Amino acid sequence: FFDRLLAIKDAYFRDGRFQMQFSLHSTDEEARRRLIPARTWDLRQIAEFGDRFYRKGDRRITLNFAPAEGQPLEPSRLVPLFSPDRFMIKLTPINPTLAAGRSGLTGLIDPADEGSCRAIAEEFEAHGFETLLSIGELRENLIGSNCGMFVAEMTGISR
């Protein structure tokens, strides 16, 4: 799949017209397996593919983190694998969905506390990574439309 995606990107979406993102959520492999209980690449595999995927003129590949309390988040662990010239960081809050509530996760990105958000971003920036704080429309939390999970559960729709 990913080799085909690379061929499509190179053929039709050159020069920054394609955005690739990997959701990592932690810099620790064991924590990632707990947070993402599905078959995933490890950090080294993501880095190796990213190095093959990136071409001069492309957008940087995004490494997305929705960091949670108690989960390792050490930007220094990324440096040996991910070049800041090819990879950037996106920090997002954990949306207050029913699934997030059941998991017991408490997000470190609090949209109401810009100072703490900036502090986390600055840790990545200190290692040379361009870092984007991606805070969505907070009204979505009030009506339960984020990720569609709340609406699906309230209506009995399952995947």
Language-model-derived ranges and their functions:
Residues 1-72, 88-91:
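Conserved SAM/AdoMet-binding glycine-rich loop
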Residues 48-60, 65-159:
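Auxiliary Fe-S-binding modules of radical SAM enzymes
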